[in-house]
Amino acid sequence: MSDVVVVESPAKAKTIEKYLGRDFTVLASYGHVRDLEEKDGAVLPDQDFAMLWGKDPRGEQQVGKIASALKGAKRLYLATDPDREGEAISWHVKDMLAERGALKGKHVQRITFNEITKRAVQYAVAHPRDLDQPLIEAYLARRALDYLVGYTLSPVLWRKLPGSRSAGRVQSVALRLICEREAEIEAFRAREYWTIEGRFTTAAGAPFTARLTHLEGRKLEQFDLPDEAAAMRAKKLAEGGSYSVASVEKRRVRRNPPPPFMTSTLQMEASRKLGMGAQQTMRTAQALYEAGHITYMRTDGVTMAREAIAAIRDHVKSEFGPNYMPAAPREYASK
C-alpha cells in the first residue's frame, strides 16, 4: 500500500518518485485541473462572489487517475509548486477528489519544497502542513478580478474599437503605462550639444583623456556648446593653453555582490547577458528546476536555506580558499 503524491508536471513526478521509493506513487496534475466556466455569470458578486467552475477534460482525466491510485492508499500529499498558483492547484485537486468521494478515510496534507533534491523532498514529506487558506483566497480574489474585468470591459472595447484585443486586469493597466511613456517620447524634442575631450600624456608616458569642464573662467553647462561652430571656437581656445595635473585622488570602492535571483532580476539578467526573452527564460528555468539544478524560480524572495548557504561556503573554501569567503554569510531581506 503506497501513499499518493501529486505534483504538477510529469517530469517532476518521475524525479520525485525516484527519490521517495516504492512506498509512494507520484502522479502529475498537468497544471490546473479546472477553471471558471467560460460564460457570463461564472462569478456572482451578488452572491458573495460565488464562482462556478467548469470541467476540463484533461483535468477530469488526471483527477480520475489520482482517485484510482488513492483506493489503496492512506495518505495524499499535495506537492504542487510553492506559490499561490501551486496552492490553488492543490485546493482544486482536493476539492474535485472530495466531490468524487475519493478522500473518505484518507489523510490529506500539503508539502512544499524550493528545490527538487532528495534531501529537500524527503524533508518536506517528513514536515507536512495543511493547505494555506489565505493563499487560496488570494488566488480566488485574483481569478475573480481577472474574470470580472475581462468579461466586463472586453465587450465594451470590441464595440468601441472593432478588431481590438481583450481587456484585462493587468494588461489594460500595462497598456496605459506604455501609452503614457510613448506620449512622453513623442513630446521629446532633441537638442544638439557638443563636448570637448583632450588626450594627454603623463610624465611617465601614460596616456589619459580629460573632458573640458571650464572655459574662460566659467563652468560649462550641458548646452553651452550648442553647435559645431561654438565647439570649434572652444576647441581653438583650449588648444592655446598649457595644462598640468593639479591633484590625484585615489579611493577604494566597495561593491557588494547582488542578492540571489528573484523572478524579475532573473529575467532582466537573462535578457541583458543572454538576449533571452521572459518566456524563454522561464521555460529554461523550469526545466532546470525540474532537473534539480536550481531552486524554485517564481519568487520575490531573496533568502536562501541555511543548508544551501553552508554547502556554498564549503565549496568556495575548498575550491578557492578562505580569502574568497566572508567571515559570515551575507543576509538579504525581501522587500
Show the residue positions of the predicted features:
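Extended, highly charged linker/hinge segments and catalytic-adjacent loops that couple domains
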Residues: D132-L135, L148, A291-K335
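Solvent-exposed alpha-helical segments within well-ordered globular domains of core cellular machineries
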Residues: K14, K18, Q61-K71, W91-D95, ...
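Conserved ATP-binding/catalytic motifs of P-loop helicase motor domains
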Residues: K106, L175, I294
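Long, highly charged, low-complexity internal segments
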Residues: T25, R34-K55, A167-Q286, E290, ...
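C-terminal or mid-to-C-terminal helical accessory/interaction module adjacent to the motor/catalytic core
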Residues: K71-G72, I116-F200, S247-R254
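Intrinsically disordered, low-complexity regulatory segments
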Residues: M1-L140, L225-P226, A333
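Short glycine-centered, acidic/aromatic-flanked micro-motifs in structured strand/loop junctions
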Residues: T80-P82, M268-A270, R298
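Conserved phosphate/pyrophosphate-binding and hydrolysis machinery centered on Walker-type P-loop NTPases
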Residues: V6, D56, E60, A79-R84, ...
